[in-house]
UniProtKB/Swiss-Prot annotation:
The keyword Isomerase applies. GO terms for biological process: D-galacturonate catabolic process; D-glucuronate catabolic process; pectin catabolic process. Binds 1 zinc ion per subunit. Keywords: Isomerase, Metal-binding, Zinc. Pathway: Glycan metabolism; pectin degradation; 2-dehydro-3-deoxy-D-gluconate from pectin: step 4/5. Its cofactor is Zn(2+). This is 4-deoxy-L-threo-5-hexosulose-uronate ketol-isomerase. GO terms for molecular function: 4-deoxy-L-threo-5-hexosulose-uronate ketol-isomerase activity; zinc ion binding. HAMAP family: KduI. Pfam families: KduI. Catalyzes the isomerization of 5-dehydro-4-deoxy-D-glucuronate to 3-deoxy-D-glycero-2,5-hexodiulosonate.
Amino acid sequence: MDVRQSIHSAHAKTLDTQGLRNEFLVEKVFVADEYTMVYSHIDRIIVGGIMPITKTVSVGGEVGKQLGVSYFLERRELGVINIGGAGTITVDGQCYEIGHRDALYVGKGAKEVVFASIDTATPAKFYYNCAPAHTTYPTKKVTPDEVSPVTLGDNLTSNRRTINKYFVPDVLETCQLSMGLTELAPGNLWNTMPCHTHERRMEVYFYFNMDDDACVFHMMGQPQETRHIVMHNEQAVISPSWSIHSGVGTKAYTFIWGMVGENQVFDDMDHVAVKDLR
């Protein structure tokens, strides 16, 4: 488990390129036949990836010890979106088939969660966010047909994109975790511009569906003290509440966003005008 401490905005603005990457970038999300796990002190979110190829991968008691509990989800909820080939997730003996861009919400109290790929030639890639939970909501599969999509932006401003809301109150109940998948239309490069912060929630972006020769310049920092982190395919970045979170790519891309914090009101944002950015 890679533990990341919280960081003050006054400290963050003094960091060089490597310093920013050390604090906020999750460089390697998927490793064959293993789970990766980054624990952030910011709202206690855990992010990572699971890519089973030659064997199943379970997340259970061994993680619980690191969290000071008996098992991983004793006091947590889990959200998973599969960006790879078809797979399965077995939760306490109940098997769910999770296809490409299907998702699974796992409620607090699940003792054993086992991940598998159906075809080793096209393994599943399970990206997950995990947050503290105060009660148990039912485990539920969500397919792309069941999400709440919103299309925003314009080709003229190069920010036309569809926001697919997987884990939001309109789709299912969670304690605090919200997750979704945003896909840019071909030829569009910008996400979340004009940008915003949300003082009441933190967020993690996971960029994927990118060519090897492409990158995204992820914008972060306070609106008057912006910085950037160069992101490549299948990398994630942690965004504190005080930071903007926007990006521009050399080509179109897709990203998964996950939020935890005070509320689940998607539109609870502190908008920042482009003219006010520095």
